[in-house]
A protein has these predicted regions:
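HIT superfamily nucleotide-processing domains
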Residues: 1-157
Length: 157
């Protein structure tokens, strides 16, 4: 259990455990994949560990490996479902002192002025909020890809 006071990450994990959080994409072994609150790049997701921990270095052994594998697998799903040319990953925890990974699809057709910018340089205020109407189909496809990749992974084990 985390020693940090409840953060937005704690609240998102609590909401993910219920059936009323529309942003939930999938439950993975290490935690929850959710759509970013602001879709600054369509398909932007977060991986939230469950249980919440303070930072990556608190995890050891299998739990650390599983989180990082789930992060990469989520990136595979986002890349496949968005047609992204690459995925940007970010793990900070400075503003919200609890482990969480940001997964951003980067596309070849992004405006030249921002194509090489890190995601925090983008206009988050102008980014559309996540909604099932606008992003639900993409969320569903990412979730299906993650479910299929889990099935293939368990067959290899």
């Amino acid at each position: 259990m985390s020693k940090t006071p409840p953060t937005a990450i704690h609240r998102m994990v609590e909401r993910s455990r219920t059936d009323d959080y529309p942003a939930v994409v999938a439950k993975l072994e290490s935690g929850w994949v959710i759509m970013g609150e602001r879709q600054v790049l369509a398909g932007y997701c977060l991986l939230l560990p469950d249980p919440v921990v303070e930072h990556l270095n608190v995890l050891t052994g299998v739990r650390r490996t599983r989180f990082l594998e789930d992060m990469a697998r989520t990136g595979d799903a986002v890349q496949h479902c968005t047609g992204a040319v690459r995925i940007n990953y970010a793990v900070f925890g400075n503003v919200e002192p609890a482990l969480h990974a940001h997964i951003f699809p980067r596309r070849a057709d992004e405006p030249a002025a921002t194509r090489t910018s890190q995601p925090w340089a983008l206009d988050w205020n102008a980014a559309p909020p996540y909604s099932d109407d606008a992003h639900g189909e993409l969320k569903r496809r990412i979730g299906e890809y993650l479910a299929k990749s889990a099935t293939h992974e368990s067959k290899r084990s």
